[in-house]
């Protein structure tokens, strides 16, 4: 009987430690480094995509990237599920080119693009960022902290 209780307790500890990782994201979202991500194949303008993301989950915004590994993770999510290779990301030019800002308010500490327009898309085929007219409609990726 004592062995059964010990094994049961051990399994409970393992289950509880695992439940704190991906279980923090809703079942149809993907987890990476404490954040949840979901691609949407519903072309919208940058502003409409950002608004849509904020309505999906508390704290959700268009995806921000803070490392090449994070950007690569999002590419693995979008490549099989989207019909296009361009997705809106949360970076936008504020104040006529003087200031770039992530829509979730996080610091711009990683960048990979050529500036031309006010909003950015990520090309999922080669993980390249491109500036694009904010009124163009594209698929997008939402992100929130788990």
From Swiss-Prot:
The highest taxon in the source lineage is: Eukaryota
Which intervals hold domain C-type lectin? 24-146
Tissue distribution is: Expressed by the venom gland.
Q: Does the keyword Calcium apply?
A: yes
Record field: transmembrane: none
Keywords annotated in UniProt: Blood coagulation cascade inhibiting toxin, Calcium, Disulfide bond, Hemostasis impairing toxin, Metal-binding, Platelet aggregation inhibiting toxin, Secreted, Signal, Toxin
The cross-references to SUPFAM superfamilies, in alphabetical order and at most eight, read: C-type lectin-like
SMART domains the record matches: CLECT
The UniProt record lists the keyword Transferase: no
List positions binding Ca(2+).
Answer: 64, 70
UniProt-annotated location(s): Secreted
Q: What is its main location?
A: secreted
Functional description taken from the UniProt entry: Anticoagulant protein which binds to the gamma-carboxyglutamic acid-domain regions of factor IX (F9) and factor X (F10) in the presence of calcium with a 1 to 1 stoichiometry. Also inhibits platelet aggregation by binding to platelet glycoprotein Ibalpha (GP1BA) and functioning as a blocker of von Willebrand factor (VWF). Is devoid of hemorrhagic and lethal activities. Possesses antithrombotic and thrombolytic activities. Also hydrolyzes the Aalpha-chain of fibrinogen (FGA). Does not affect the Bbeta-chain (FGB) and the gamma chain (FGG).
State the family it belongs to.
Belongs to the snaclec family.
Subunit composition and interactions: Heterodimer of subunits A and B; disulfide-linked.
The protein's name: Snaclec agkisacutacin subunit B
Native species: Deinagkistrodon acutus (Hundred-pace snake)
